């Protein structure tokens, strides 16, 4: 089957169409703007899969309806999912704009004095607003000379932020969310809302009962050679941690081996269900070999599976990581407990950064007073105002141990195309695999256990659905913190020390939900959240605006907030604008 091509970014150079001197004097400058924009994007950005982003430039500058239509025909044939219109001059507004209502679009009007690029920008944006097709405005802060072909830093920042978010929109469109199972323990996020996926993300939901996973395992609908490779890899790299089970629930070596084998098979089969596997076709299993075209998935697990079969912790942890027995590769997005809304936050983070995502329970707020009472030690540094314990049953990406290093040697989580095999091995070495607690998981399993290194910038996110309002997005930028070992051990022992831990300190603003750490926890909309590496809340805000998902909570500096220009017409308070605009325009893929 032919592989689906990646979305491209279309560059639309628009120009003043008056001949006999005007257009002729602008052709080179206008096309050079387009080429510079394409070069910047191709150099700086990659798709989440690691491939370089490809730009498609219109064959000619666009002065009116005919050339605009020719450009659209070219873009339609080359899977252009995002457009950027560029110009250094006055052009004819509504005659030259991109009218596709589903495609994210921006306009860069050159800030120069020789020709009025800003005037076209304003006129074109007015047309977009009047027609109900929002567009993003890009206009440099400082005047440039007409022969200056450089892209100023502020323009570059907006071009790249727009392009990253736009590609995320285009990449999700037409894909599916694989709902493997149903509602887990009454968790609202696992009540999968088909309308949300269809109307806001342009995705389908593929609902599959967990018996399909059982069938694939029992009937050997997998690559048996790969299973042997996976087992050998686990034998080499897995370190086993403490078994906290009572003696009557502990498994012997043979039983533990069977649990490990099934856990690895679950990872293989869930992956095959998501993306397909041509090896299955070689076994005559053509239907199963196709997969479900899933860009994200969720596994119910609890309790209808886990009461008798190994839990999903090992499978989910390995799938969400940037590496496995096949080496370093793009991480998958698999939500624990089929929490589809946390899965969407994971998907957004992965599409924006190319990195693995850390799924976690937003478990406990520890105040400075409570920590000192329990441990006898004060919280200091970034933790001084309190911390949030992010911990779940072991399905977090192993990248979350932060054993990878950036160019300055700091702990981080890299996009998978930058990860060295030695860094993947270091993440594995920092992870213990602890037998699942019988009281929770009667069918057994192994939970990954690691401690995230401190001082790493993270952005925590969550999507929630509010009846009568629709989806909303929460964002909290902050840092992981390293606690003194004795303090960590005491606090960790009070919950479940066989699970992975991140101690998180959000950045406080002194206002609203970020007035203190307690308020961050109190305003969080659900029991789960996602950690994405870096302070990338501004990228999430831009992406949410494209999808018409209002942001109900964030601590991003106002200067970094970048939304379509029409948002400014929806009032003077910037967050109220977001709500009113999202309500006015409705979901991107209205149904």
Curated annotation (Swiss-Prot):
Its EC number is 5.3.1.25. InterPro entries: Fuc/Ara_isomerase_C, Fuc_iso_dom3_sf, Fuc_isomerase_C, Fucose_iso_dom1_sf, Fucose_iso_N1, Fucose_isomerase, Fucose_isomerase_dom2_sf, Fucose_isomerase_N/cen_sf. Its cofactor is Mn(2+). It is found in: Cytoplasm. Keywords: Carbohydrate metabolism, Cytoplasm, Fucose metabolism, Isomerase, Manganese, Metal-binding. It catalyses: L-fucose = L-fuculose. The active site is at residues 337, 361. One of its GO terms (molecular function) is arabinose isomerase activity. It comes from the Bacteria. Pathway: Carbohydrate degradation; L-fucose degradation; L-lactaldehyde and glycerone phosphate from L-fucose: step 1/3. Gene3D superfamilies: 3.40.50.1070, L-fucose Isomerase, Chain A, domain 2, L-fucose/L-arabinose isomerase, C-terminal. Converts the aldose L-fucose into the corresponding ketose L-fuculose. PANTHER family: L-FUCOSE ISOMERASE. This is L-fucose isomerase. It comes from Klebsiella pneumoniae subsp. pneumoniae (strain ATCC 700721 / MGH 78578).
């Amino acid at each position: 089957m032919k592989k689906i091509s990646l979305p491209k970014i279309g560059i639309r150079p628009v120009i003043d169409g008056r001949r006999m001197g005007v257009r002729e004097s602008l052709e080179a400058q206008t096309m050079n703007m387009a080429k510079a924009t394409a070069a910047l994007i191709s150099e700086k950005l990659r798709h989440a899969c690691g491939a370089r982003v490809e730009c498609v430039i219109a064959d000619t500058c666009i002065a009116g309806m005919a050339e605009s239509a020719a450009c659209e025909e070219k873009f339609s044939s080359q899977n252009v999912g995002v457009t950027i219109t560029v110009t250094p001059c006055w052009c004819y507004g509504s005659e030259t704009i991109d009218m596709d209502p589903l495609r994210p679009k921006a306009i860069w009007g050159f800030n120069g004095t020789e020709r009025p690029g800003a005037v076209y920008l304003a006129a074109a944006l007015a047309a977009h607003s009047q027609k109900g097709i929002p567009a993003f405005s890009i206009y440099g802060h400082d005047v440039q000379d007409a022969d200056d072909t450089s892209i100023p830093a502020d323009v570059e920042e907006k071009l790249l932020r727009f392009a990253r978010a736009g590609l995320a929109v285009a990449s999700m469109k037409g894909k599916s969310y694989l709902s493997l199972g149903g509602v887990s323990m009454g968790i609202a996020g696992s009540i999968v809302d088909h309308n949300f996926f269809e109307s806001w993300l342009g995705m389908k939901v593929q609902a599959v009962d967990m018996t399909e996973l059982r069938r694939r395992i029992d009937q050997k609908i997998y690559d048996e050679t790969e299973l042997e490779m996976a087992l050998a890899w686990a034998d080499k790299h897995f370190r086993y941690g403490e078994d906290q089970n009572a003696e009557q629930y502990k498994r012997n070596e043979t039983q533990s081996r069977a649990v490990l084998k099934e856990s690895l098979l679950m990872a293989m089969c869930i992956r095959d269900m998501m993306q397909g596997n041509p090896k299955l076709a070689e076994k005559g299993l053509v239907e199963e070999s196709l997969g479900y075209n899933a860009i994200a998935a969720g596994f119910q697990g609890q309790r209808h599976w886990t009461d008798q079969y190994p839990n999903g912790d090992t499978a989910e942890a390995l799938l969400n990581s940037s590496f496995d027995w096949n080496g370093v590769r793009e991480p998958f997005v698999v939500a624990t407990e089929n929490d589809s809304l946390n899965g969407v936050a994971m998907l957004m983070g992965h599409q924006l950064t190319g990195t693995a995502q850390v799924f976690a329970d937003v478990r406990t707020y520890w105040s400075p007073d409570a920590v000192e009472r329990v441990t006898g030690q004060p919280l200091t540094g970034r933790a001084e105002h309190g911390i949030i314990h992010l911990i779940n049953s072991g399905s977090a990406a192993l990248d979350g141990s932060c054993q990878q290093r950036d160019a300055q040697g700091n702990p981080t989580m890299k996009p998978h195309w930058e990860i060295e095999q030695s860094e993947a091995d270091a993440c594995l070495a920092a992870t213990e695999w602890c037998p699942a607690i019988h009281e929770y998981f009667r069918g057994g399993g192994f939970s990954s256990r690691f401690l995230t290194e401190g001082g790493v910038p993270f952005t925590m996110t969550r999507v929630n659905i509010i009846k009568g309002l629709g989806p909303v997005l929460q964002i909290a930028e902050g840092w992981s913190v390293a606690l003194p070992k004795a303090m960590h051990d005491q606090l960790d022992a009070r919950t479940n020390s066989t699970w992975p831990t991140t101690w998180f300190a959000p950045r406080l603003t002194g206002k609203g939900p970020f007035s203190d750490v307690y308020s961050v926890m109190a305003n969080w909309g659900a029991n789960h959240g996602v950690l994405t590496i870096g302070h990338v809340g501004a990228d999430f805000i831009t992406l949410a605006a494209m999808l018409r998902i209002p942001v109900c909570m964030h601590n991003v500096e106002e200067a970094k907030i970048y939304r379509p220009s029409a948002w400014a017409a929806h009032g003077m308070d910037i967050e109220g604008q977001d709500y009113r605009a999202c309500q006015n325009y409705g979901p991107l893929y209205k149904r």
